[in-house]
């Protein structure tokens, strides 16, 4: 236990562990610096990987290391911990850590934030924030912390939050700034199972390439996101960006056609290339605010979409010849339903193939 009883920033100082540990001969596949057995935990402390960008490594090519913290049994806890800089944050995916509790984590992990799976049940991930400025806003005089500016790197290399085989997981009031994937759902590498039913409340992804990504899902997957704020920013080396990505390619067999992603009360803004890319499964939006919708707001390349009581605020210039719209149903897309929505430039959509566009908005 360290000196902090509240969430804290690198610049606030306090109890810290400075490390040059890089996994030894095993490198990033080595043991974690801190290993938490059942019922063990860490709180009130700051961690800093001093050699992340030294000795032949740099901010463009930082050192690869194991996760700083690994849970190895049930009811582990990580509370009021800050990662000033590190390659990987918290591993709750390699073991069953049922009942894990993560609260008020902050920091800048470069390649991995918090990864959760392993069949864990009843865990909590809440009130955490990942942001590159934890690596550059230091205490008075520096106090030995490495000064690193990692914005561009994390935007192209980090997977901040990963959820795989978990049950009854509480995912509440979390925020990620700068990541390839802000929040990411995928098949479990340990159990081989897919994400089941889970609810995400108050999640924010900003400065991300894909703010929410469902990579793997079976017929029983049902992810509900409530009060999300999903944001893209212009990232020079990321030519495709979207708030939502359902499946990694058109009609991918990694996402079952009956897998469901449901978003309620969502705020979408920034600089997307496409608002939502749907490659398979069923995605539903209810009360979404598309402040910017990109070239195509809801781009159904495979699978289905439903859009209810939502607002499309981006103006579409006359004479775009179908290159822009609030929706596109691709050749292999099955259907899009549009009901009770408002479009600042009127309902504009593009359609290829035999799929169906329907709902009260289609006159």
What are these regions (language model features)?
Residues 3, 33, 39-44, 75, ...:
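Detector for repetitive beta-architecture
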Residues 9-10, 22-31, 51-59, 86-93, ...:
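Short glycine/acidic-rich loop motifs that flank beta-strands on beta-rich extracellular proteins
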Residues 9-10, 190-195, 220, 253-256:
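Short, solvent-exposed loop/turn segments that connect beta-strands within catalytic domains
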Residues 20, 35-37, 48-53, 70-72, ...:
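A structural detector for beta-sheet-dominated domains
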Residues 292, 297-298, 304-363:
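Leucine-rich solenoid repeat scaffolds
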Residues 248-257, 262:
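Extracellular and organelle-lumenal recognition/adhesion modules and their flexible linkers in secreted
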Residues 61-64, 179-203:
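C-terminal/domain-terminus segments
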Residues 1-44, 48-76, 88-95, 116:
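Extracellular beta-strand-rich solenoid/capping regions of secreted or surface-exposed proteins
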């Amino acid at each position: 236990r360290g000196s902090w009883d509240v969430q804290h920033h690198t610049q606030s100082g306090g109890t810290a562990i400075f490390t040059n540990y890089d996994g030894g001969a095993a490198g990033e596949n080595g043991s974690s610096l801190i290993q938490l057995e059942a019922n063990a935990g860490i709180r009130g402390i700051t961690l800093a990987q001093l050699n992340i960008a030294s000795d032949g490594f740099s901010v463009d090519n930082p050192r690869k290391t194991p996760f700083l913290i690994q849970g190895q049994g049930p009811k582990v806890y990580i509370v009021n911990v800050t990662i000033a800089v590190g390659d990987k944050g918290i591993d709750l995916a390699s073991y069953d850590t049922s009942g894990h509790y993560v609260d008020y984590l902050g920091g800048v992990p470069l390649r991995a934030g918090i990864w959760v799976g392993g069949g864990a049940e009843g865990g909590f991930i809440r009130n955490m924030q990942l942001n590159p400025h934890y690596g550059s806003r230091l205490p008075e005089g520096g106090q030995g912390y490495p000064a690193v500016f990692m914005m561009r790197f994390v935007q192209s290399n980090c997977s901040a939050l990963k959820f795989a085989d978990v049950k009854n997981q509480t995912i509440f009031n979390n925020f990620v700034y700068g990541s390839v994937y802000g929040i990411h759902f995928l098949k479990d590498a340990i159990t081989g199972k897919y994400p089941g039913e889970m609810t995400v409340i108050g999640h924010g992804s900003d400065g991300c390439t894909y703010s929410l990504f469902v990579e793997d899902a079976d017929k029983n997957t049902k992810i509900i996101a409530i009060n999300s704020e999903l944001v893209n920013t212009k990232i020079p080396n990321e030519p495709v960006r979207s708030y939502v990505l359902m499946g990694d390619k058109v009609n991918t067999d990694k996402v079952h056609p009956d897998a469901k992603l449901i978003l309620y009360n969502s705020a979408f803004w920034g600089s997307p290339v496409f608002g939502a890319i749907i490659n398979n499964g069923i995605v539903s939006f209810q009360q979404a605010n598309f402040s910017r919708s990109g070239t195509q707001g809801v781009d159904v390349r495979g699978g289905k979409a439903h859009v209810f009581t939502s607002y499309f605020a981006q103006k579409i210039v006359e004479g775009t010849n179908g290159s822009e719209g609030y929706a596109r149903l691709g050749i292999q897309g099955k259907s899009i339903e549009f009901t009770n929505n408002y479009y600042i430039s009127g309902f504009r959509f593009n359609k290829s193939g035999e799929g169906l566009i329907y709902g009260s908005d289609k006159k």
